[in-house]
Amino acid sequence: MKVLHTVAEFRQARAAFDVLGFVPTMGYLHQGHLALVEQARRECPAVAVSIFVNPTQFGPNEDYARYPRDTNRDLALLEAAGVDLVFIPSVEEMYPPGFGTYVIQPAADEVLEGAARPGHFRGVATVVCKLFNIVQPTKSYFGQKDAQQTVVVRQMVRDLNLPVEIVIVPTVREPDGLALSSRNVYLNAEQRAAAPVLYRALRTAAERYAAGERDAETLRAVMRSVLAGEPLARPDYVSVAHPLTLRELDRIGADGALLSMAVRFDQVRLIDNWLLEGEGK
C-alpha cells in the first residue's frame, strides 16, 4: 500500500493502474467507510482512498478543529482492507495560495443540509471535483447515509461530464439502528442511548408508507411524533422529499421519496435517511 501526500506523487503512482475504484473520506474510519472499500475491492482491480478533512465544507461555528482524526489507525484499517493507494494531502496542497475556483449548485443550498449549513455543498462539490481530477477514478463509492451529498455529486458528474461512475452503498448501522458516523464518538452514554430514535422515526414512517400512506405531511408528523418521545432529541428538520430533486413533497408519487432528518443531542448533530421505493420499482 502506497501512502502519497502530493498531487504529483499520486499521479505518478496512479499511472500503474488502468481501472481504479476510489473512496473519498475525511478519515476517522468506521465500518461504513470499510463497506465502501469492500465494494470497491469487489468491483475494481485496484482501490484508492483519500483522507482529507476538508475545511471548505465546514461552517464558521462547526466542528472542523475538533473533527476526530487518527491517521495511523486509519492506515492500519486500509492496509488490512487491501487498499492500493492512499492520498493524504495537506490543506495547502488542496487549496494553495490564490485558490479561487468553486463548484456551486444553487439548488442544493436551498434545501435540507444545504439550507441548514450554508456553503457546505460548495465545499463538498469543489473538493470532490478536485479529487476526481487528481485521482482519475473509474468508479467512486459513496454512502447512502449522506443522501444529499450523493445527489450533489451525481449531478456534478452529469453536468460537468466527469468520466467517473458513481456507486451508492447502503447505510451501515449499529445493531440498534444508529447509522455509523465519525461524529458518533462525540455522544456521551446518555445521548448514545437516545440516538437510535432517528432510525425508529424513519422506520415508523416507512412502515406507514408500506401500509399505503402517501400523504407526505402525515409521514412528517409520524416522524416528529417519534422524535418528540425522546427528551434529548432536538430536530433541526424532518423531511419527505423527492429522491432526485430533494424538494418537499405534498404527496408521494411514482418516484417514491427520501425520508430524512437532522437531530441535535446538545452539541452533537446527527443525520439519517430512508429511501422509499416508488411504485413498481
Swiss-Prot record:
Beta-alanine binds at residue 57. Pathway: Cofactor biosynthesis; (R)-pantothenate biosynthesis; (R)-pantothenate from (R)-pantoate and beta-alanine: step 1/1. The keyword ATP-binding applies. Pfam families: Pantoate_ligase. Signal peptide: none annotated. It is found in: Cytoplasm. (R)-pantoate binds at residues 57, 149. One of its GO terms (biological process) is pantothenate biosynthetic process. Its main location: cytoplasm. The active site is at 33 (proton donor). The keyword ATP-binding applies. Keywords: ATP-binding, Cytoplasm, Ligase, Nucleotide-binding, Pantothenate biosynthesis. Homodimer. Belongs to the pantothenate synthetase family. This is Pantothenate synthetase. The gene is panC.
